[in-house]
């Protein structure tokens, strides 16, 4: 009985659209309904396919892979805590995002929702990071405090500055006021990723050959991984934090919503949910989760390695994390 090698994805990950379609599988909220029994069955299906007990790569195998990829961490092979799986990203962030987008929050409200947002960010960054290098509890606590302080500082500062921009019209001030949460979220989100994954930058992350064998740790690979993740966070936040408030401003001028103010929050939540579901896979797909790179872009120790066949290694891989 011959063994089978399971492809990394059902889709072509060398293309943006292929990565988006793969991300749609990973972020599909329906996978959250999978039970422990479903997960165990999916793992066994993949093992049976790898062992050659299942000959054909059909939809049953692909569905099993979808459950496994959306539930287990690629490094530890352990289930990610459900609220912080990428398939739960939209649902977990929904309440926090809606809270931050409320107009006229005031200082206390701004601080509270930025604190909530960064707490969720810390949890997602920690749960989905590259696990070859991990933060200690004191390091995580310090990074958490830094990220929360930065986001609150940016948000409060912008809330104070915008009303004082007397050269702007009242409508322009209103638009900037609605976009203040985005500036805070984007800047703090980048800082959060770099702080929560700072140990990866200091120690490096595991780099692998095409057979999955570790070749050692690379700080340069870590910089690529963390930098791309931070950028994807900004790309993801942009439509979510910009489109709903601007559309809502437009809708609030319509008679049907102006005469029914109680519908404002449900409409806002609907806009946020729809935008989030569309934006998340588009943002994740910008960069491959399993990044391939020339060893000559890394440290000298990776430049002239050879594989088991004594052939030069011309491409290495690392897990970027989500």
Swiss-Prot record:
Signal peptide: none annotated. One of its GO terms (biological process) is mitochondrial transmembrane transport. GO terms for molecular function: L-serine transmembrane transporter activity; monoatomic ion transmembrane transporter activity; transmembrane transporter activity. GO terms for cellular component: mitochondrial inner membrane; mitochondrion. It comes from the Eukaryota. Pfam families: SFXNs. Keywords: Amino-acid transport, Membrane, Mitochondrion, Transmembrane, Transmembrane helix, Transport. NCBIfam families: mtc. Mitochondrial amino-acid transporter that mediates transport of serine into mitochondria. This is Sideroflexin fsf1.
